[in-house]
Each structure stands twice: as structure tokens, then as C-alpha cells.
Amino acid sequence: MLRLEEIDLDTIKKELDEERKKVEEIMKGNIPTEIKDLIKMVLFIVESPNKARTIANFFGKPSVRRIGNIKAYETTTGKYILTIVATKGHLFELTLKEEGVYGVLKEKEYVPIFSPIKKCLDCGHQFVDEDKCPRCGSENIDDASDRIKVLRDLAQEADIVLIGTDPDAEGEKIAYDVYSIIRPYNKNIYRAEFHEVTRQAIIKALEEIRDINTNRVKAQLVRRIEDRWIGFALSQRLWSRFKKKTLSAGRVQTPVLGFIIKRYEEYKKNRAHYYAVKTSDFEVTFISDDPLEKYDKTIKIEKIEEKESEKKPLPPYTTDSLLRDAVIELRLSVDKIMALAQNLFEWGLITYHRTDSTHISNLGIQIAQTYIENTFGKEYFYPRHWGEEGTHEAIRPTKPIDTETLIKMLREGDIQIQGITKEHIRLYDLIFRRFIASQMKPFIAIETKFNAVWSNLNTTIEGITDIKENGWNLIKPIKLLAIKEGEYEVIDVKHWIGSKVPLYTQADVIELMKEQNIGRPSTYATIVKKLFERYYVIEKNQRLIPTERGIKVYQYLTERFGHLVDVKLTADLLEKMDRIENGELDYMDVLRSFKKELIEIWKTKETKYIADGIYKWKEYSVPAIVYERYEKILKRKKVYPEYLTPWSRAIYNALPLDNEIEKQTLALAIEKDFEILTKKPILREYKKKYEHLKNLVDQLL
């Protein structure tokens, strides 16, 4: 196997520069056209500017074109002339215009309406449809429409368009959006999928192109529509109940909030007295249900058991296990950790970080072998694939470079990365050590169990007291339990009141989401972040505490819509989305079930909601007072949109009518008068007069 120090970097750089000069000559027309015809002009579209810059530098120093505020990197692989440009994430979001039901039309099938995303450059707020920021009023806006125009212009210059967005359902949706907007300008559009940003992976992706995976796209559409229909509808109920439009609800968000609240209730019920007893050599913590009146001056340690055991390494990181460890060891939020991991991926330092697989490829094993044999010796290398090959690998480094070497290469300019911080380095170190340990042999440990006795209290202490034979502990050192049998003088005692049931950390919540099957690698951090943003929970000493607002919101949602935010239903729903992604389930059937749930939300009795009114029109005859108002408003010659509340406006947009006055009037009548409809007796003499109005309701239903 070729070692890193054996690679002639100068020769490789020279070859790349020669290839680049050759392509420049081709473009100037100085090389025969038969050679020129063999080289394809490729527009390579990725998500982030970081990734675009990293990829461009794999093939020599790129030239840069600036088109508006978009950078396009131009380079060559020898076979392709690449123009690499970034979408900067999603281009479209469901419209907030009053189109259909929350931006989804019902024709033969459900048709979501998307609008280009806009971002305020002053306050960072993201929105659609408005011409200025709805939060701060700024007109300093980054509009995805500008990027769409650039992509279309560049597509016309290319022979082939390759879309290299992230290798998951969300990335596939972005790829589909890009495909849709440039299809009229270039017919040769394909998907390029890679799971690490390395030269080798990019070259492989360019050669193994495929079509868009429409099943992945359908799954992502279902996720988005479900969030808009159910999440938005539940959120609107919260706005009405609590008079605050910053509140939100969702299938996953609400059960997770419930986990935290229930844990907090258990925490309060299991209060106890804690005593940290300190000697000159160690500290032991005891728990008592009642306070102690006096303390012993000594503590006694008795050995219970000692045994030799083989300690195998843990598998390499998945998203949830990385978040769990990084929260504890780096003391960072899950949102921050995912942002750092995204950077490491885009810089080509780690593989894709949204994964639930522990599998390691042959290439990954070779990377581990190179490092382990050079650093510790061949006898410590113990290769493992860690499960069957799937869509993704585990999270691992892309090169046999440890943290010390990485820092050295950054300082000497061998690796050039803009914006890398100590936090990035610490996270990389965590990933690197876990991965290398997973490919090393077990170590042999001496485990010892002790009983500690003090002031009539007992507690068990156990841990590793010695290493008999080294293994993966060389890359992940083990802290030994420094305690021995004997009687020791107590030099200090600290007392506090705590709980036998600890509050959850962010790491615990991620683990619960994984266990209950209500989260995915792409959603773990987002869900936790929302709970903080809505002020449903706060964090104290890394422990999660529900706020009064969070408790009230959860009580309200579970009392009225408990079955819709149930853990089991949420898990079943996510399983259905997985089946859609695998082509095993029709996504339209799932959307139809969502529509039924949406109507169920509307039909709750607390306020004047759309479906209440609609169903009462069907159930009762319309009294004269309603018809008279309807007839009077019909005589107007102008529509007054300001009369429409959010609910009547939603009905107005859903009505399949051409007459604006009729639409507005019926919408107002349904919302304003449904209570009258339930209380007034049937007035049969008016039946013929209001028959037309009933027919309009029938059309809506």
C-alpha cells in the first residue's frame, strides 16, 4: 500500500496544471477539434459554496467567474471541463399565498405550489412571496430567483448537467427542483452522488451518473406537505388559544416535548439528599432519602469482585451517536454540532454526516490500516465492516490524518481551509478516534467492583483499575479507577438536594428519538433546536427543563389532538415515508390520510374553524338570516378582501367558484354564522332561496 509520504505531490500538481493548460488551448481553438469533441463541458451543481470550492481545487487551481453574486469555478478533470456552482441550499418552499389548502391544490391529485425562497441579509429571516422582509421590513434580500436564472444561463453553455446535491431525500428534492427549472434549457441532466468530498469520490461520481430518484423526492414532498398541513394547522390552533404566533407544533416536536416534560415530573417526584464525600485520594457520592444528622469521619472501601475482561470497541459514529457524544464531551448544542459536521463534510475531511449506518467500506478500512500500522503497529489492526453495506457509510475521516497532523498541515499551508475553528478540530478528533478505535483489536482490562460505606450509607463503585493488554485504548485512552481497599479519612463533605431520576440532556433526547423511531438523521438537531426557539424548554447545566409555556402547549395539544401527536402514530408515519422512498407505497394515499386528519383538526369545537361551518351547512338547513346577508352582499359590485379572516380566507381560496362576490360571501357566512346554523330551527319556507348557497357548499366538499 502506498504511504502518504511516498506520494510525489509536486508531480501530481504539475500533471494537473498541464491538463488545465491543455483545456485552455482547446477552448482557444489551438488543438484539433477531434480532441476537443472528446471533452465534454459539464455544469456541476452542488449545494454549498464551500463544497464547490473544495471540489474545484481537486483538479488544479480553478478560474473563477462571478455571475451577479454567484461564483462559478471552472476547472478540468482531463475528460471534462467542469463549471462548478452552488445552489446555496433549497431554492423553493411551499407558498404562503392563499392557494388551495395551505399551498396545496387538489386537482386529479394533490399538487403543492412552491415559490422561490428569499432571505433577508439584515436579520437572516427566510421567507417566500413577499417583496421585503416581513420581520424587519428590509429590502436587502437574497432571492433564489437570481440563482435560478444563473443556473439556466449556465445550463445552456453545457453539454451535460450533473447535480451533486447531498445523498439523501432532502438532497434529492433539491436535485429535482434544479432538474425542473433547467430542463427546458438542457435535456442532458443527471444525478451525481457522492458520500465524501474527495478527489477519488468525485471522479467516481462523475463516471457513475444516474437519474433522479423520484421515490426519494415523493418522500420529501410528503414530509413537507405533512408539516404544512398538520404542523401548520396545529400551530394555528396554538396561535388562537395562546394569542402568540411564534408557537408551533408538529408530529415529532410535540412527542419530544412530552418526553422532556414527563422526565421533569419524574425528577420532581424522586428528590433525594446527595453527599459528595472527599478524601485525599478520591471522592464518592452517596444518596439518602432523608437528611443526615451527623457525618462519619472516615469512609470504608471494600473490594467485592475483580475480573479480567475483553473490551471490544464501539462501532464508528452514526448521526445520533455522534450528537450524543459531542453534546457530552464538547458541551455544544446539537444544532451547533451538525453545523460543524456539515463544514467538515464540505471541506472533504469526513464522510456524509447524516447517516444511521455503521458500515465501513473497503476504502475506509484501508484508511484505518494505513494509520494504525504506521502509528501503533500491524498487530493492532483488526478490520471490521460493521454491518451490511447500505445507502450510506458511518461517519469517518476521509484520510489517515489525525488531529495533530491536520493542525500541522493547516499551519504549513499543505491544506487550505477557510473558517476552520478549534471546535471543528475537536469534533474531527472525536470522529477520528472513534473510527480508528473501531478498526483496532480489543484490549484486556482488569475490572473491579467496590462497596463504599459511610454514615450508614452504602454505594457501589466499579470500573477499570488496570490494563493487562493494550488495544484500541491506545487511540482512546481509558481513565482508570484510582481507588483501593481500606479506610480513609474524610476531609470534606458537600451536601445538596437532587433527584434519583436525572433530567434529560440533548444527547438523551436524541437517543430517545432514535429508540422510539420518531426521528431521522436529518431531523434530530432541527427538532431540538425548535424546542429552544419556541421557549418550550430551557437548558441549565446541560439539563433540559420544560417551561410553563411548553407544559401548557403540550397539555393543550395532547388533550385535544392526542392521537395526532402520539409517538406510535408518528413512528408509523415515518415508516410510511421510508416505504414511499423505497417505492413500496403510493404517496398520494398517504396525503389523502393527511387531508382527513387536517379536517379533523378543523372540526374541533373550541373556536370558529372552517370545517365546523362547512359540516353544519351540510347538516342543517340555512336560516333566513344567513340568506338575507348573503343576498345583500351579492348586490355589491366590489370585493372587500379585508373582511376575510384567516379562516374565511382559506375557505374563500378553496371554493371552486369564479364569482368573487359569491366566494367571499360564502366564506364569511360559513365562518361567521355556523353557530346560528346549529341553534336556529329549520325554516322550510326559505328552502328554495338558499338552495343555491347549499349547492356551493356541496361543491366545496
Curated annotation (Swiss-Prot):
Any one of the GO BP annotations: DNA topological change
Q: Which UniProt keywords apply?
A: Cytoplasm, DNA-binding, Isomerase, Magnesium, Metal-binding, Topoisomerase, Zinc, Zinc-finger
Keyword flag Isomerase: yes
Cellular location(s): Cytoplasm
UniProt binding sites for Mg(2+): E47, D166
SMART domains from the UniProt entry: TOP1Ac, TOP1Bc, TOPRIM
Q: Where are the zinc fingers (RG C-terminal-type)?
A: 117-143
Q: Which CDD domains match?
A: TOP1Ac, TOPRIM_TopoIA_RevGyr
Enzyme Commission number, as recorded: 5.6.2.-
Per its UniProt record, what Pfam families does this chain match? Topoisom_bac, Toprim
Q: How is the cofactor bound?
A: Binds 1 zinc ion per subunit.
Cofactor(s) needed for function:
Zn(2+); Mg(2+)
Topo IA-type catalytic domain residues are: 213-602
Q: What are the Toprim domain coordinates in residue numbering?
A: 41-197
Any one GO molecular function term:
reverse gyrase activity
Residue positions annotated to bind Zn(2+) are: C120, C123, C133, C136
**Where is it chiefly localized?**
cytoplasm
Tell what the record comments on domains.
Introduction of positive supercoils requires the cooperation of both the helicase-like and topoisomerase domains of the 2 subunits. The helicase-like domain probably does not directly unwind DNA, but more likely acts by driving ATP-dependent conformational changes within the whole enzyme.
What other remark does the UniProt record contain for this protein?
This enzyme is the only unique feature of hyperthermophilic bacteria/archaea known and seems to be essential for adaptation to life at high temperatures. It may play a role in stabilization of DNA at high temperatures.
Q: What does this protein do?
A: Modifies the topological state of DNA by introducing positive supercoils in an ATP-dependent process. Binds to single-stranded DNA, transiently cleaves and then rejoins the end, introducing a positive supercoil in the process. The scissile phosphodiester is attacked by the catalytic tyrosine of the enzyme, resulting in the formation of a DNA-(5'-phosphotyrosyl)-enzyme intermediate. Probably involved in rewinding DNA strands in regions of the chromosome that have opened up to allow replication, transcription, DNA repair or for DNA protection.
Similarity comment: Belongs to the type IA topoisomerase family.
What name does this protein carry? Reverse gyrase subunit A
Which gene holds the coding sequence for this protein? rgyA
